[in-house]
Structure formats: structure tokens, C-alpha cells
A protein has these predicted regions:
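Residue-level recognition of single "structural anchor" positions
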Residues: 1-259
């Protein structure tokens, strides 16, 4: 699928728990149990859930998530935003960086090694939140890759629900994380509905994301219906807004779709 250059991806992760049974762990089946993180990527313009990944809070998991996102971009480079986890910048440089040979200095000695630098089209900004007593007291935005004016202009093009200009933030993905907890029983806190292992949790996330993208219309994406029709609004799903689908899918269509 092809996305425009104004697309904004917001990687984010949140924590969940899989209670670990010591007897199961003793039998060698405990690797997929215990605490884990859910990594997610979201396109706010279309309210599209791009990828979800169950893993640890490591560089390896960040690489897997961004490789999934890369498969959705069809070669385009959007504006990336995230929290201040350093793994995102490292992996973005791996995937979208270029090797640059330093200019010779004319001085004696061993020449400098080639360096990995960001490509001119790569744009990435971070949001850092400082907390005191469990409350956010300060929010700082920093631009890691890209020109400041270009990043700010692209972020401002994303309109908020009240019509005001957007800014560099992670509020959309955080709100979608709340919706995900409401939709998926496995993520509910202090209940007996927890996942028993990571594999089943990953399958549940994939289904919920597909249902939200193709089956469930989003109120912020609806369009004004033609005056001759009986409807006031035409419902649209995130997949329709992104140009992936031309209709609202039924649940049966999703379950019977052959990938």
C-alpha cells in the first residue's frame, strides 16, 4: 500500500502482565510468560493501526516493529514521532540511514571510518515527559532527524478534533492505547482475563487491529452524505480513509479473507 509523505507514524509501547507459573517455567515453557510490552504504531490522519508487537522493551523489539512499519510504507518516508525511548532513533538510522565518508583533512594519520547518517528525507521527533509524584509536570519536544521547520509544518498539518493545528505529541497513540484496553479483555488490569502466553496475545492483537481498521467505522472519519440520500453521514473505516478499502467490511468478510 502507498502512503503520502504527510503520514505520521507514532510508535508507542505499554506494559501488560502474564502471570508466570513456576511449575510451567521449570518445564522450559516459561519464556513466553511473565511481564511483557506491547509495541504499537499508529497513523493519526487515518486512525489506522499499522502494527502491534508483543515483546520486551529492547532494541530487538523496536527493530521488529519498525521493520513491520517499513513494509507498509512502500518506500515513502513519513514523519515519525514517539516517546523518548532511544531505541527508535537507533533503528531508524539503521533502516533509513546512509553511509557517509568523511572528507579528508589533509593531516597525517589513519583516515576516518565511514559513518551512518540520516537520509535528508528522514524526519523524526521525540516527546519527553517529566513526572513528579506520578504527574506530568513538563513536556519537551525534540527533533532528532530532519529540519525543524519541515517537521513543525508537517506536524501542524494534522488537525485536531477541535479544528486547531496539531503539534508534535503522542496523544493520539495514547488515546488509542486506552481504546485497545477497553476492546481487548486480555489487557484489562486486575482481572482473570489475562493472556496465558505471548503467542495468543499477538493473535488477539492482530485480530483487534484488523477489526478496527476494516470493520469498525470511526466517527472522526465520516463524510457528509449526498443530499439526495437518506443518510446525513457516510461511515468510513480507517482502511477506507487510507485508500486500502472501498467499503465497510462485515465481520464475516474479515474472518473469511484469505491473506
Amino acid at each position: 500500500m502507498s502512503f503520502g509523505p504527510s503520514l505520521k507514524k507514532t510508535p508507542k509501547s505499554h506494559w501488560t502482565d502474564h502471570p508466570k507459573n513456576p511449575l510451567i517455567a521449570k518445564k522450559g515453557r516459561g519464556r513466553s510468560l511473565g511481564s511483557t510490552w506491547i509495541w504499537r504504531a499508529f497513523a493519526p490522519e487515518f486512525r489506522l493501526r499499522l502494527a502491534s508487537l508483543v515483546g520486551n522493551r529492547t532494541l530487538y523489539s523496536a527493530r521488529r516493529l519498525l521493520q513491520k512499519i517499513r513494509g507498509c510504507l512502500n518506500g515513502t518516508l513519513p514523519l515519525f514521532t514517539s516517546d523518548s525511548l532511544p531505541h527508535y532513533a537507533d533503528v531508524l538510522l539503521e533502516l533509513y540511514g546512509q553511509w557517509k565518508k568523511p572528507q579528508p583533512t589533509g593531516l597525517p594519520g589513519r583516515p576516518c571510518n565511514v559513518q551512518r547518517v540520516a537520509s535528508p528525507d528522514l524526519r523524526y521527533a521525540q516527546v519527553h515527559k517529566e513526572r513528579q509524584g506520578g504527574r506530568v509536570v513538563k513536556v519537551t519536544q525534540s527533533i532528532i532527524f530532519g529540519k525543524r521547520r519541515t517537521v513543525q509544518t508537517q506536524a501542524a498539518s494534522l488537525k485536531r478534533a477541535d479544528g486547531s493545528e496539531g503539534q508534535i505529541n503522542t496523544s493520539y497513540i495514547e488515546r488509542d492505547n486506552l481504546a485497545l484496553r477497553q476492546e481487548l479483555r486480555r489487557l484489562a488490569r486486575k482481572t482473570l482475563g489475562f493472556s496465558k502466553n505471548r503467542r495468543e496475545l499477538q493473535h488477539a492483537l492482530d485480530f483487534i487491529d484488523a477489526h478496527d481498521n476494516f470493520v469498525k467505522p470511526h466517527g472522526a472519519l465520516r463524510l457528509k452524505a449526498p443530499p439526495e440520500g437518506s443518510r446525513t453521514w457516510e461511515p468510513r473505516t480507517p482502511a477506507m480513509a487510507a485508500g486500502i478499502s472501498d467499503h465497510v467490511w462485515k465481520l464475516e468478510e474479515l474472518l473469511c479473507y484469505k491473506a
